Amino acid sequence: MQQVDDAVARSGVDAGLLTLELTESVLVHDMDDAVGKMRALHAMGVRLSLDDFGAGYASLSYLRELPFAEMKIDRAFTRGIVRDAHAATITRNLLQLGRDLGIDVIAEGVEQDDQFALLGEQGCQLFQGYLFGRPMEAAAFRQRLVSP
């Protein structure tokens, strides 16, 4: 907590521009401790993201009880969305759930144009995956930002 507060203070950046991505394992390990820290981060203005939603033991109660600003749909659903009607139905409903709760939803693992198109048709507006770029070193990322 203090480390995040110090980093925000040192950088001079608005805490609302910072999003911390949490995995389910953080919540399962010590729920009471995690909840307290999450509420404190939220009070500072930090946005919280629930990673890999739909995989593992992620519970809908997390979305009800915890101050998440966004959730990321696990790639297990987006990977098969074009060929698997069940995956498409689950993804469509997770997108609707996010809209209804006022939570941004990011589709992870988008690697092909047909996945991107179908997710867009379902109302998805935020995407992550190799279709848009591969992981890169910080120097390469800076160069990409300044290149026309």
What are these regions (language model features)?
Residues 8-14, 80:
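Phosphate/pyrophosphate-binding loops at sites that engage ATP/ADP/AMP, CoA/4′-phosphopantetheine
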Residues 17-32, 44-148:
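EAL-family c-di-GMP phosphodiesterase catalytic domain
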